[in-house]
Amino acid sequence: MPVTVVDHPLVRHKLGLLRENNISTKNFRELANEIGRLLTYEATKSLPTEKKTIHGWAGPVEVDQLVGKKITVVPILRAGLGMMDGVVDMIPGVKVSVVGMYRNEETLEPVRYYVKLAKKIHKRHAMILDPMLATGGTLVATINLLKEAGCRRIMGLFLVCAPEGLARLEKEHPDVEVYTAAIDERLNENGYILPGLGDAGDKIFGTK
């Protein structure tokens, strides 16, 4: 399974700021979007382009333009919305598909409560957004949904990942590409990532 840890000084610095326990909602939102933007840069660098001649200020000029399948960004509600603006900044015309999942705190398994996918999603590459890949249950359920809808190329963008979640993804969907700012140490007994970020959804939305 292709896993890319985006090892860049800016990413490491911004992730370090995100880990501060008393970070403000404003700063957490801004940093999550900034890292999302940097992850998008890495995740899209293999997109195909073609040469096209346009009319420049001094006459015809040959440029590169994206070609091929379009992308749909898939934020997993609610925390995935905290990375979406950064991605949309990089790909302004991207279509947004929304998947609502929450994790049952007792079983740690995902529960789906809302789905709204882009039209002709089977013709698009899907880019899943979720700040944290913990047990992998929510991610696997989302990938199952997208594959059932016809998606053939799926990637996931995460601020931090747990080894346990990556192992589950490797077992169930080894074809999915992962882009992350860090792979953390482990999950605790409650299924939270250590050292992690705390509850990313609460920090993004200012709730508890």
UniProtKB/Swiss-Prot annotation:
One of its GO terms (biological process) is UMP salvage. Allosterically activated by GTP. 5-phospho-alpha-D-ribose 1-diphosphate binds at residues 78, 103, 130-138, 199. The gene is upp. NCBIfam families: PRK00129.1 (NF001097), upp (TIGR01091). Pathway: Pyrimidine metabolism; UMP biosynthesis via salvage pathway; UMP from uracil: step 1/1. SUPFAM superfamilies: PRTase-like. This is Uracil phosphoribosyltransferase. Binds 1 Mg(2+) ion per subunit. The magnesium is bound as Mg-PRPP. Uracil binds at residues 193, 198-200.
